Amino acid sequence: MEKASGRQSIALSTVETGTVNPGLELMEKEVEPEGSKRTDAQGHSLGDGLGPSTYQRRSRWPFSKARSFCKTHASLFKKILLGLLCLAYAAYLLAACILNFQRALALFVITCLVIFVLVHSFLKKLLGKKLTRCLKPFENSRLRLWTKWVFAGVSLVGLILWLALDTAQRPEQLIPFAGICMFILILFACSKHHSAVSWRTVFSGLGLQFVFGILVIRTDLGYTVFQWLGEQVQIFLNYTVAGSSFVFGDTLVKDVFAFQALPIIIFFGCVVSILYYLGLVQWVVQKVAWFLQITMGTTATETLAVAGNIFVGMTEAPLLIRPYLGDMTLSEIHAVMTGGFATISGTVLGAFIAFGVDASSLISASVMAAPCALASSKLAYPEVEESKFKSEEGVKLPRGKERNVLEAASNGAVDAIGLATNVAANLIAFLAVLAFINAALSWLGELVDIQGLTFQVICSYLLRPMVFMMGVEWTDCPMVAEMVGIKFFINEFVAYQQLSQYKNKRLSGMEEWIEGEKQWISVRAEIITTFSLCGFANLSSIGITLGGLTSIVPHRKSDLSKVVVRALFTGACVSLISACMAGILYVPRGAEADCVSFPNTSFTNRTYETYMCCRGLFQSTSLNGTNPPSFSGPWEDKEFSAMALTNCCGFYNNTVCA
C-alpha cells in the first residue's frame, strides 16, 4: 500500500515542453525485471531510465523550441525577408538605370506604377474615412455650387482663348470644332427627353475628353508616353509569334493573315484573364469609374460598365455589373450599351495593331471614348427615373472564379478562341457579302451607263460632307468616307483592313496619284480615321449586344429592345466626335526629312520620305529647253541637285523627267 500510495503521489508531468518526467522514469525502473538488457531502437536499455518515447521527445526538444520561436516571430521574419528583397530589387533597379536608363525605362515605369498603387492603398486605409468625414459638410453647401460655376466659367474662357490662339496659325482646325457642335445638335434633336438633359454631365464629359486629348496628342510628355506605351504593346504582342510559329510554322505565320493576327487575340485574351484574376483590371476600372462619377455626376453602375469597356468587350463589360442590371433604369441601360458600341475591347485592340494601325492612336481613342460615351448617352437618353445606384457603396466588382493563375491563363486562352473564330468568320462573310454587293451595284449601274458603281463609291458621296466636318482634307474625304461607311454598315475589321492597305501604300513610297486616282491618304487623315473607326457601332453589333444582355436579364428583353437602336446611333456619334477631337488637336510631329542631304544617301528603295523629297524636288525644278534644268528653293545652287533629279526620275514619272 505504501508503495502504491507512493506511486500515486508522484506527479506525471507532461513532456510536451521537453522537461524530464521523474515519476515516469521511476515507474519504468520498478516494472522492468532486474538484469533486463533489452535495448530500444536507439541502443539504450530500458534500465537506464530512457524509454523510446522519452528519448525521442528529448531529442526533438531543440526542434520544437525552434519551431515555436519561428511561429511566434513569423510576421517579423516575413517583414525582414520582404525588406531584404526590396533592398535587393532597389539595388538592381538602380544599377540597371545607371548603366542604361533607356533600356531600363520599362522596368522603371512598372516599378513606379506598383509603388503608386501601394501608396494609394495605404493612404486610403489610413486617411480615407477621415477625408470623407471632412468633405461631407461640403457636399450640399453653397460653396460647392459656387465652385462648380467658377470652374465651369474658367474652363469656358480657357477653351475660347486656346481655340483663338491655336487656330490662328491653323484655321482649318475650326472645321472639326464645328463638327463637334453639329453632332451635339444632332444628338439633342434626337433626344428622348429634351427638357431633362443634364448639361453639366454633357459638357463635363466633352471637357474631360478634350483635356485628355490635349495631354495625349499635344503635350510632348503625353505624346511621348503614349507613343512609348504603344511601342511596348506592339513588342509584347510580338511574343505571340513564338507560340504561333511553333504550332503553324514560320511560313504560315509570316504570309497568312489568319495565322498572324488571330493568335494575337488568343494571347491577349490569356493576359487579360490573368490580370482579371489578379484583380488589376477591377482596380483600374474602379478608379476610372470613380473619377468619371465625381466629375460627371453619373451613377455608379453605368459608370463602371463604361469604364470597363476600355479593357473588355461590349458583352463582357455588363458582366461587371451583372447583379444590378435588373434594377437599372432605361437611361442607365442605354449608357451601358452606348459604352459598348463606342469602344473596342483589349483583345480586338491586338488584332487591329497587327493590321498595322497606329497603336498609340488606338489606345488614346479607347480611353477618350469613355467620358464622351457617358456624355452623349445622357444627351440622347437623359435620366428621368430615380436610380438606385447613385453611390458606389454596395456596388462591388466580382473577382474571377479561377483558383490559380494557371487556370485563369488557360480559361482566358480557351475563351479567346471563340472570339478569334468569330473574327475570322465575320471577315470571310462580310468581305464576301461586300464583294457581292459591289458586283450587284456595278451590274445595276452598267444598265444605265454608270461605270464603277460600288458600295464604297456610294458611301464616299453620301458621307463626304460629314467626314469633311471631322477635319479631313477634301481630297482625302472620299477614301475616308468609304471606310466610315464600311465600318457602320459592314464591320470595323474590314474598315481597318482597308486603312492598313492605304497606310502600307504610303509607307512604300507609292505615288499619291496614279492616273487621276488617289492611292493613299495623309498622316493626318490616317489619325482621324483611326479615331472614327474605333468602336463596335455597326449594324451586326445589335444582335450581339441584345443576345449578351438578354442572357443576363431575360425579363428585361423588351426594355433592351427599346433602347438598342438609339444606343447604336449614339455610339457611332461618339466615335465621330472623338475623330473631331483628333482633328482639332492633331499637328504634324517629328522632324521632317532633310531632303537636301537625303539624296546623298543611297536610293536603294522607295519610301514615304523618298517620295516626299522627290515631289519637292520636282516642284523646284524648271526646264530651260535644251539647257540643263534650273532649281529653286532649297535645291538652288546645289551641286548634287541634278544627280538627285536623275535618281528621283528613276523611281517616279514626272513632266520634268522627260
Curated annotation (Swiss-Prot):
Transmembrane segments: 80-100, 104-123, 148-166, 172-192, 200-220, 233-253, 260-280, 295-314, 336-355, 362-381, 423-443, 454-474, 529-549, 567-587
Region of interest called Disordered, as start-end residue ranges on this chain: 1-55
Compositional bias ranges of the Polar residues kind: 1-20
Keyword Transmembrane tagged: yes
Gene Ontology CC annotation, any one: apicolateral plasma membrane
Ranges of compositional bias, category Basic and acidic residues: 26-41
Taxonomy, superkingdom: Eukaryota
Membrane topology: Multi-pass membrane protein
Pfam families for the chain: Gate (PF07670), Nucleos_tra2_C (PF07662), Nucleos_tra2_N (PF01773)
Protein activity control: Inhibited by formycin B.
Keywords on record: Cell membrane, Membrane, Phosphoprotein, Transmembrane, Transmembrane helix, Transport
GO MF entry, a single one: pyrimidine- and adenosine-specific:sodium symporter activity
Free-text tissue specificity from the UniProt record: Expressed in heart and skeletal muscle followed by liver, kidney, intestine, pancreas, placenta and brain. Weak expression in lung. In testis, primarily localized to the apicolateral membranes of Sertoli cells and vascular endothelial cells, and weakly expressed in Leydig cells, peritubular myoid cells and germ cells.
Record family assignment: Belongs to the concentrative nucleoside transporter (CNT) (TC 2.A.41) family.
Function: Sodium-dependent and purine-selective transporter. Exhibits the transport characteristics of the nucleoside transport system cif or N1 subtype (N1/cif) (selective for purine nucleosides and uridine). Plays a critical role in specific uptake and salvage of purine nucleosides in kidney and other tissues. May contribute to regulate the transport of organic compounds in testes across the blood-testis-barrier.
Name of the protein described by the UniProt record: Sodium/nucleoside cotransporter 2
Annotated source species: Homo sapiens (Human)
